[in-house]
Design a protein with these regions (language model features):
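Tandem repeat scaffolds
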Residues: 1-246
């Protein structure tokens, strides 16, 4: 039996750790791999700079935890059978990195995510509500998030500023960015079919090489200076009810 006060010991167990609560544990710069947690709760734990590989966190919740500059590789945060995801509430994800992970149906709520990176991962149905910029004194430092080569179909991004973020080579079909600020965001090479940009601002956004059948420009708040590829012109004209002849 693992004492609930010993998270480091729990990571060393060969059998799954089920239904335990870990609070106020400090695993700064901790390195671990191949552990499995199910229905566990992590409160006020520190994982800053940790490197976590090939671990599973099934139906887990992280509340008020810090993951600054932590790295996750090939980790799973969703139940493969029920598709129930894990929850992240009021966590510090600043400069954290997730590579080749499964974050499908996860809920990221009221977190900080300045320069968060998610690459080569699945995050279908992700619910994302996080501050992606950093305020220093009275000055706002723009950072955004970086999501590249990710499956994000049906993801919902809460109305917020994602300015200067990069959503590149991602599957963004059926995603929602309603009422969000996407100024200077890069959507290069992503699939945008049925994406919801209602009320969103896409000023100087880059949609080059992105794929879409139609784009509801009228529903956007603004798209001044938006960049598209030449091969997208026909679809954009069709979206406005304009047909090309000759």
């Amino acid at each position: 039996m693992v004492e609930k006060s010993s998270l480091e010991a729990a990571f060393s167990m060969k059998e799954p750790v089920i239904g335990l609560r870990f609070a106020s544990e400090d695993l700064t710069d901790f390195i671990t791999s191949e552990s499995k947690f199910a229905d566990c709760r992590f409160n006020d734990c520190v994982f800053d700079g940790a490197k976590i590989r090939e671990c599973e966190f099934i139906g887990c919740s992280f509340s008020n935890c810090s993951f600054k500059e932590a790295e996750f590789f090939n980790c799973i945060f969703v139940d493969r059978e029920t598709q129930a995801g894990s929850a992240w509430n009021y966590c510090d994800l600043n400069e954290a990195k997730f590579k080749a992970c499964n974050l499908s149906n996860n809920r990221i709520v009221k977190c900080e995510a300045f320069l968060l990176e998610i690459t080569d991962s699945s995050a279908v149905g992700l619910q994302f509500d996080a501050e992606v910029h950093r305020k220093i004194s009275k000055r706002m430092m723009f950072g955004g998030v970086v999501l590249q080569r990710c499956k994000l179909q049906y993801a919902v991004f809460a109305a917020s500023s994602y300015e200067e973020s990069r959503f590149e080579s991602c599957d963004l079909r059926d995603c929602s960015f309603v009422d969000s600020n996407l100024s200077r965001v890069s959507l290069m090479g992503s699939s945008l079919n049925n994406i919801d940009f209602t009320g969103a601002t896409l000023d100087f956004a880059n949609l080059s090489q992105a794929t879409f059948d139609e784009m509801d420009l009228a529903a956007m708040a603004s798209f001044k200076g938006m960049t598209v590829s030449r091969d997208q012109h026909e679809n954009l004209l069709r979206s406005m009810g304009i047909l090309t002849s000759g």
